């Protein structure tokens, strides 16, 4: 968010005392760097691939999270903050087309106001919403928003999802 030069570059963030990898960019994931992996075990991969390494800054993450959550509250009065980077919104009453347009607007607003790219997954349950979000992140065809409402689409999404990737 604060350094556009890092866009599309491999990046990792380390835990307290810089012991383990706590988050990685898509580019760092593609290098095989795993979540929770001890930093010393991947130091060579990091050096070889010019991966940018940052110490964690929880105060900053909390502030950015609060900004995003406040934006979400402007789109739905029913927001359940699940974690520092996840929330569930009730979007009852939307038709499919309106829902897609609304979700794209939410996504665009968060990017414009907070500078953070987000993916949005919509489903009738939290688990289906999480699966939809996973698909929205991984498949560019969704353009960051995946809605699992129709039975065929839900079945297709479930068949594509490994059981160990299912939340809950």
Tell where the protein language model's regions lie, with residue ranges.
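Residues that scaffold, gate, or flank divalent-cation-dependent active/transport sites
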Residues: 1-84, 88
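Short, hinge-like loop/turn segments at secondary-structure boundaries
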Residues: 30, 99, 136-139
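Short secondary-structure capping/junction motifs at helix and strand boundaries
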Residues: 51-52, 77-82, 99, 111-120
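Generic non-transmembrane alpha-helical segments
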Residues: 67, 71-75, 105-114
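Helix-hairpin-helix
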Residues: 85, 120, 159-168
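Catalytic palm subdomain of template-directed nucleic-acid polymerases
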Residues: 89-107
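Structured, non-catalytic alpha/beta "coupling" segments that mediate domain-domain communication
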Residues: 115-134
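A short, charged helix-loop
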Residues: 140-163
């Amino acid at each position: 968010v604060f350094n556009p030069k890092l866009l599309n570059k491999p990046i990792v963030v380390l835990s307290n005392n810089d012991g383990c990898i706590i988050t990685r960019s898509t580019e760092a994931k593609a290098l095989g760097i795993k979540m929770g992996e001890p930093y010393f075990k991947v130091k060579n991969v990091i050096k070889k691939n010019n991966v940018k390494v940052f110490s964690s800054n929880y105060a900053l993450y909390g502030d950015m999270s609060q900004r995003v959550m406040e934006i979400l509250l402007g789109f739905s009065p029913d927001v359940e903050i699940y974690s520092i980077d996840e929330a569930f919104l009730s979007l009852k009453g939307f038709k499919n087309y309106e829902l897609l347009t609304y979700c794209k607007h939410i996504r665009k607003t968060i990017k414009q106001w907070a500078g953070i790219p987000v993916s949005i997954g919509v489903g009738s349950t939290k688990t289906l919403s999480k699966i939809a979000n996973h698909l929205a992140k991984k498949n560019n065809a969704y353009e960051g928003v995946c809605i699992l409402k129709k039975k065929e689409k839900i079945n297709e999404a479930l068949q594509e999802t490994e059981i160990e990737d299912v939340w809950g």
